[in-house]
Swiss-Prot record:
NCBIfam families cross-referenced by the UniProt entry: L9 (TIGR00158)
Gene Ontology BP annotations: translation
GO cellular component, one term: ribonucleoprotein complex
Name this polypeptide is given: Large ribosomal subunit protein bL9
GO MF annotations, alphabetized: rRNA binding; structural constituent of ribosome
PROSITE patterns (alphabetical): RIBOSOMAL_L9
Name of encoding gene: rplI
């Protein structure tokens, strides 16, 4: 199905281009979200008549997105979640969670603007791309931790999932003596 793009669409084309796409993609995504028009003669004439207005509106949206991008780029946000000892979350962090935490900080973002290939399922610092406009993309850092104190430690670069190694000598035990005692106990039973 041929459509006329009303805005830049990643991996497809620029505003004003006529592209050939699958009918389902056109109906369910491009046409439904107002990103394209069917490429009929009437729509082509209508688009050319409205082109200047569409370009001006696109430029305004881009400028607004750039203002937000300046403030948002490089920001770090903390998400507190429960996890196991190995750092694997009991749930996951989705785009909805990201939109909620970023909105609480005063930014206007939609969950569809976050680009996650898969949900975040581990503790740690994660870099997440945010597409504010088809031509404006920034990255934020999401610090997923079990507590605010742990988030501070992660921000300093400390690992919170490693088990602390301990020395038996620090516990006041002689390794050889402990092994010998364990061996004697086995002889008494046998």
């Amino acid at each position: 199905m041929e459509v006329i793009l009303l805005e830049r669409v990643a991996k497809l084309g620029q505003m004003g281009e006529t592209v050939n796409v699958r009918p389902g993609f056109a109906r369910n995504f491009l046409l439904a979200r107002g990103k394209a028009l069917r490429a009929t003669e009437a729509n082509k004439k209508h688009f050319e008549a409205q082109r200047a207005q569409l370009e001006a509106r696109n430029l305004d949206r881009k400028k607004d997105a750039e203002v937000v991008a300046e403030k948002l780029n490089g920001q770090s946000f903390i998400l507190i979640r429960q996890s196991g000892e190995t750092g694997v979350l009991y749930g996951s962090v989705s785009t909805r969670d990201l939109a909620e935490v970023v909105s609480k900080e005063g930014f206007t973002v939609d969950r569809g603007q976050f680009t996650l290939n898969q949900p975040i399922k581990t503790l740690g610092l994660h870099t997440v791309p945010v597409v504010l406009h088809p031509e404006v993309e920034v990255e934020i850092t999401v610090n997923v931790a079990r507590s605010p104190e742990e988030a501070e430690r992660q921000a300093r670069g400390e690992s919170v999932t490693e088990r602390e190694a301990f020395n038996l000598d620090d516990l006041g035990l002689e390794v050889g003596q402990a092994l010998a005692d364990a061996g004697e106990g086995a002889d008494d039973r046998g």
